[in-house]
Amino acid sequence: MDATYWGKNFGVLLIVDAYRKRLLWRKFLDKKETIADYLEGIEWLREHKFKILGIVCDGLWGLPQALARYKVQYCQFHQVKTVDEYLTKNPQTDAGKELQKIAHLLCHTDKKSFIGMLDMWYEKWGEWLKHRTLDKNTGKKTYTHRRVRSAYFS
C-alpha cells in the first residue's frame, strides 16, 4: 500500500498484490492520503474476499495502529529514506556515516545480520548517543546528537 503524488494536489493510493505483482485497488486523491483512505481499500479487499496475509505500508502516522488486526511492516524503502532525512546525504559524524551505511544494507541482507550490525553499532556508539548539552535559552539539557539519535530509533 502506498500513495504517489504528482504535484501537491493530485495523487493515487494503490494496493498491490505482492505475490502476483498485480494492482488490486486504487483511489485517486486530491489531497494527502488519510487513514480512512487506506481503510476504504482494506474494506474493499475484504468485501471481495481477498485474504490479507500482511500489509507493507509507509509511515503514515497512526496507520499501523489502525491496521493492528493484520501483520504490518514498515516499507524498507521508506525506512531508509527516513534515516537519510535525519542524517542528510552527507553525515558529518563518524557515527552517522556508519549508521547510514548500515541502513542502506537493509534491503540487501537478512533480519539476523541487520540486527547484528545495528547491535554492534549501538555497542560502539550508544554512550555517545546519550550525550546531552545544556540549552542556553531554556536552561534544559537536550541530546547533543539528536539527528543521529532519531535516525537510530526510527
Where are these regions (language model features)?
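Short, amphipathic alpha-helical segments
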Residues: 32-39, 57, 74-77, 93, ...
